[in-house]
Amino acid sequence: MKIIAMITARSTSSRFPRKHLALLGGKPMIQNIIENLRLLKHIDEIVLATTTKDTDNDLVELCMSEGISIFRGSEDDLTLRHGGVLVMCNPDIVIPISGDCPFMDIDGCQAVIDAAIAHPDYDGYSIQSPYARCPEMMIAAHRRSWFTKAFQVYEEDPTVCGADQYNVAVNLNPDRFSKYVVDGTDIIDRTVTSMKFSIDWRLEMEFFNAVIEGMGYYPHHITDFIKAFTDMRNIGFTWRDKGAS
């Protein structure tokens, strides 16, 4: 069985161009994502799925220096880009990672991978808790069958979304996909407040850099943020964007 992690990233975000190369905790954000994935067991290959545009050359060079595989394809059609990764790597299971999600709860993510290995008769795998939702810190896992069905449901009605968001078509057709859901009750602490952990804006990058500086280390668990936010509140932490006037 071959398991890959597929990082989808490009440098032409209108909200925060080249954000994957911006420093988070003293390292490029994409490097933190790669290091997170290397903490997980059973991942055989990490792949960057990016575009053929010259604007992504720096991103590709950094990822190559980290020793991960590269696939370059369409900027706007993720069915083609992700399909190209499937052809190149021939995986049994894919862990899709968004390039703007630099934080992972390692225990929760590992539980999803372990479930995908232990329960092979499903298209997709995820984790849920009756308490807080922190989707950007968790992962999903998809078998090849998930992508086959996902591309098909998008092709059946491409008007529901753009090809860069074909997952919308998947969400509109949940009955077409079999799914195993890991019980995250004992993994996701009930005291966690639901919040956004992805980085789409410079302001968010500045905020999380301040949090990491306050912690003194890079977080790998949701509980790290609980402690950090509690400590920052107790010392009367105040912060504003450095670019604010």
Describe every region a protein language model picked out.
Residues 1-17:
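N-terminal nucleotide-binding beta1-loop-alpha1 segment
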Residues 4-6, 45-47, 180:
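A structural signal for isolated positions on well-ordered beta-strands in alpha/beta enzyme cores
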Residues 9, 50-52:
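Short beta-strand/turn micro-motifs composed of small residues
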Residues 29-46, 59-61, 65-66:
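A short, N-terminal amphipathic alpha-helix
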Residues 52-117:
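Short phosphate-binding loop-to-helix
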Residues 104-195, 206, 210, 226-245:
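Conserved core of the sugar-phosphate nucleotidyltransferase
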Residues 201:
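Short, conserved phosphate/pyrophosphate- and ester-handling motifs at nucleotide-, phospho-/glycolipid
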